[in-house]
């Protein structure tokens, strides 16, 4: 099936599946098959922010005063987060848009990917402020062995889906020879790769950021690197939306409500999805071990972080219909919720950047009674 950027075949978008239907032609938002994606778009747009809005000048002083092992923790997490959001800033668009067939999901994916680019820009904003030569930090990302171990597990599912999608659009179903390699293309196999890719992305959004988040917030609990923590808090708020998006996609697919064949595929892939999550959790535990190899920090150590990884992994896996692999049932660092739930904290607006501020959410109506107490 050849992909077209504007199909001239008239269709009823309310009857199209999320994926593998007719490519989206008119981007219309007066009707939605799944209004959850429209709500996510509106919420993400209301969250719009820029890293330059947050003052990180004090962080440079704090960073210079940190002991070496805490500098290692801080800068390593920024490297890892830069990798994750570099992937997420482009991959959802490249991998998913050619397969999507409803406008609200198409626009949600574009909105999601755009917000990830803001996250990438944020890390540059932070790193540029605390080190004299940011290139030293960025150049290490593609050579750091610990980061590379994680990169392969994240990118491989995207790459496989993108490759088979290209064959499907260009060659169609069947067995083909491409550059001397025999390639078998089938719609069912492509659907399976899509499902596994979405599950991998879900694991990324659900687990892979949270060791880094916890460290950033632990510094701020000690009134250190507070500008960084404010930015990370905004990023965490966005990531919670992205996680909700992938969870809804997966649950619609595995229920069979969108595509009955996807329910069968979800059942077939259940063990592979389980293993995928467990592997992601183990990689995050290994990352915690790497971070704390030279010493822990006040309020946080490797063991506590590993328990937290197990705790959130259970919650995230349950949300997409998978069995729970770990015994940990309670949150070992409950203070982190203060940072992850923006409504939990009241601040004086003149003192700090207000992370709960929403764009386009103001009631602009003014009544004459509102001015009755004014005197000239």
UniProtKB/Swiss-Prot annotation:
Gene Ontology MF terms in the entry: identical protein binding; iron ion binding; ribonucleoside-diphosphate reductase activity, thioredoxin disulfide as acceptor
Cofactors, names only: Fe cation
Top-level taxon of the source organism: Bacteria
Pfam family membership, one: Ribonuc_red_sm
Gene3D superfamilies named in the record: Ribonucleotide Reductase, subunit A
UniProt: Fe cation 1 binding residues: 85, 116, 119
Substrates-to-products reaction catalysed: a 2'-deoxyribonucleoside 5'-diphosphate + [thioredoxin]-disulfide + H2O = a ribonucleoside 5'-diphosphate + [thioredoxin]-dithiol
Residue numbers annotated as active site: 123
Activity regulation annotation text: Inhibited by hydroxyurea, leads to dNTP depletion, replication fork arrest and genomic instability.
Coiled coil (residue ranges): none
Keyword terms of this UniProt record: Deoxyribonucleotide synthesis, Iron, Metal-binding, Oxidoreductase
Comment on bound cofactor: Binds 2 iron ions per subunit.
Induction notes from the record: Induced 4.2-fold by hydroxyurea (at protein level).
GO biological process per UniProt: 2'-deoxyribonucleotide biosynthetic process; deoxyribonucleotide biosynthetic process; nucleobase-containing small molecule interconversion; ribonucleoside diphosphate metabolic process
Enzyme Commission number: 1.17.4.1
Recorded GO CC terms: cytoplasm; cytosol; ribonucleoside-diphosphate reductase complex
Keyword Oxidoreductase tagged: yes
UniProt-annotated binding residues for Fe cation 2: 116, 205, 239, 242
Family annotation (InterPro entries): Ferritin-like_SF (IPR009078), RNR-like (IPR012348), RNR_small (IPR033909), RNR_small_AS (IPR030475), RNR_small_fam (IPR000358)
Subunit structure: Tetramer of two alpha (R1) and two beta (R2) subunits. The B1 protein is a dimer of alpha subunits. A radical transfer pathway occurs between Tyr-123 of R2 and R1.
Family according to the record: Belongs to the ribonucleoside diphosphate reductase small chain family.
Note: E.coli produces two separate class I enzymes. This one is the functional enzyme during growth. A substrate-binding catalytic site, located on R1, is formed only in the presence of the second subunit R2.
Biological role stated in the UniProt entry: Provides the precursors necessary for DNA synthesis. Catalyzes the biosynthesis of deoxyribonucleotides from the corresponding ribonucleotides. R2 contains the tyrosyl radical required for catalysis.
Name used for this protein in its record: Ribonucleoside-diphosphate reductase 1 subunit beta
Native source organism of the sequence: Escherichia coli (strain K12)
